[in-house]
């Protein structure tokens, strides 16, 4: 059973909003009590929270499906449904959240950092909230909006100040155990280290963290060995340290060629966090070289021979023996100095100020386009019309009429006519496809009909904007004529 998991794919589903309630107040001695249906509760959201006590993504490996509770349905007597509680999911420090396309959504660093991974759906309005002068007692309510569903990739990138990189069996784990209290697995065979090991190092009054990652081999950036899976753990490191085995007996290997091979892998690796200005490219990080295993006479001689050649690259060189504990103190204080210089040279992070961009006044909020998959059909896109369709109960004619009114006021019907839509053509809004009938009069005064029905849906003639204007003028003329007749009768 794996104990360390640093990459998982999870399925997050936020809670749906509760449905609104369609209810009429009934009480003794209170006729015409009016609508009293409450609103549905908001669905719970899924929120990632950094917990310093969590160090792996193992829990997500066994439970990749995460669901937040939904909101409760509204009830009569103006009682709103309870909102679904937000689900707070604990993640390790250094977790990176990617969407299904690999796009970076959040970089969670620091205890208590929060990120809303999936937003809960809004609750539907009850008929009490939908009542108006034209529709005094609606016989319908709006449905709750479905919660957001997302497929996310979580990657754990170790938060450490120093990253130790080197070939397998170079002595990286031994070095971590020698300069810190960490106790990684140490053995005399390659790839002993299968997971990153962290150690806390004391440099006088200061402390810093060191990460030991599995050994790299040529081609690690392309997926060979374990390097591709664990190179991400050095992305956050301020200083990279090449740990070189000066006592290796492998043919064709020497300290210079090992350093060149490691540098080639760093240059070929593309960090996920490349957009973070505080990190920069891996090849731009400060680097040091540790020539290890100098307790072997031949290794010490080789280290002394190549020391000046490596120093010409501008990197500090340390001769170390973890067995004899030689050269550890100069290494520790040298690394702390490099960390301090790197951090002081980084630009100060300025907190981002929230920017509010109001929707332009002339923005209709929707777009009508021909459907490329079906000639003669149209697609209506936009946040508002798509949300309205999701919240409509199509088993209720009055709710369908209300949707038609909203779309007409938004201008969808007029835009379809302008683009040449014909009766019976398919119109898709969100996940719903309609057979558009322009004869259905929308946007006019609601006529009296039974609750849950809409008499306009039974008519076959379409009433346009000009006809509605003429009807209002005729009603005003009729009212004026009736008022004049009444006044003449009173004078007589």
Curated annotation (Swiss-Prot):
Cofactor(s) the record lists: Mg(2+)
Keywords, ordered alphabetically: Cytoplasm, GTP-binding, Hydrolase, Magnesium, Metal-binding, Nucleotide-binding
Stretches assigned to the OBG-type G domain: 160-340
Pfam families hit by this protein: DUF1967, GTP1_OBG, MMR_HSR1
Binding site for GTP: 166-173, 191-195, 212-215, 292-295, 321-323
Start and end residues of each Obg domain: 2-159
Record localization: Cytoplasm
Residues annotated as domain OCT: 358-438
Membrane-traversing stretches: none
EC number of this enzyme: 3.6.5.-
Record-level GO cellular component terms: cytoplasm
Enzyme class: hydrolase
A GO MF label: GTP binding
Protein name: GTPase Obg
Gene: obg
């Amino acid at each position: 059973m794996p104990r360390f998991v640093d990459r998982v794919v999870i399925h997050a589903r936020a809670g749906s909003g509760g449905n609104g309630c369609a209810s009429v107040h009934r009480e003794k001695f209170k006729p015409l009590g009016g609508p009293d249906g409450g609103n549905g509760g908001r669905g719970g959201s899924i929120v990632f929270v950094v917990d310093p006590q969590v160090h792996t993504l193992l829990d997500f490996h066994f439970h990749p499906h995460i669901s937040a509770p939904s909101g409760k349905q509204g009830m009569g007597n103006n009682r709103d449904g309870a909102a679904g509680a937000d689900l707070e999911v604990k993640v390790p420090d250094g977790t990176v959240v990617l969407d299904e396309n690999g796009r970076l959504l959040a970089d969670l660093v620091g205890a208590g950092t929060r990120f809303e991974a999936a937003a809960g759906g809004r609750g539907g309005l009850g008929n009490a909230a939908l009542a108006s002068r034209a529709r005094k007692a609606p016989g319908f309510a709006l449905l709750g909006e479905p919660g957001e569903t997302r497929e996310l990739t979580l990657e754990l990138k170790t938060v450490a100040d120093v990253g130790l990189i080197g070939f397998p069996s170079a002595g990286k784990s031994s070095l971590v155990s020698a300069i810190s209290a960490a106790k990684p697995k140490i053995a005399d065979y390659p790839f002993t280290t299968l997971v990153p090991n962290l150690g806390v190092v004391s440099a006088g009054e200061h402390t810093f963290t060191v990460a030991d990652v599995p050994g790299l081999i040529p081609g690690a950036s392309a997926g060979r060995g374990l390097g591709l899976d664990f190179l991400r753990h050095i992305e956050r490191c301020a200083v990279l340290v090449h740990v070189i085995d000066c006592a290796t007996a492998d043919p064709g290997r020497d300290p210079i060629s090992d350093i060149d091979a490691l540098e080639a892998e760093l240059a070929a690796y593309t960090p996920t966090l490349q957009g973070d200005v505080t990190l920069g490219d891996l090849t731009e990080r400060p680097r040091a070289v540790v020539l290890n295993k100098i307790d072997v006479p031949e290794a010490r001689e080789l280290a002394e021979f190549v020391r000046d050649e490596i120093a010409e690259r501008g990197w500090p060189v340390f001769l170390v023996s973890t067995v004899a504990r030689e050269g550890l103190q100069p290494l520790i204080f040298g690394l702390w100095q490099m960390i301090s210089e790197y951090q002081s040279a980084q630009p100060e992070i300025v907190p981002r100020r929230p920017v509010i961009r109001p929707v332009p006044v002339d923005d209709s909020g929707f777009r009508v386009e021909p459907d490329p998959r079906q000639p003669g059909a149209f697609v209506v896109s936009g946040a508002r019309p798509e949300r309205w369709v999701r919240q409509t109960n199509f088993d209720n004619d009055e709710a369908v009429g209300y949707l038609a009114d909203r779309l007409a006021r938004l201008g969808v019907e007029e835009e379809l006519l302008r683009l040449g839509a014909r009766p019976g053509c398919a119109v898709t809004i969100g996940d719903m496809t309609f057979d558009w009938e322009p004869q259905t009069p929308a946007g006019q005064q609601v006529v009296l009909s039974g609750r849950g029905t809409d008499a306009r849906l039974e008519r076959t003639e379409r009433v346009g904007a000009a006809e509605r204007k003429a009807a209002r003028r005729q009603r005003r003329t009729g009212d004026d004529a009736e008022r004049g007749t009444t006044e003449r009768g009173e004078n007589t």
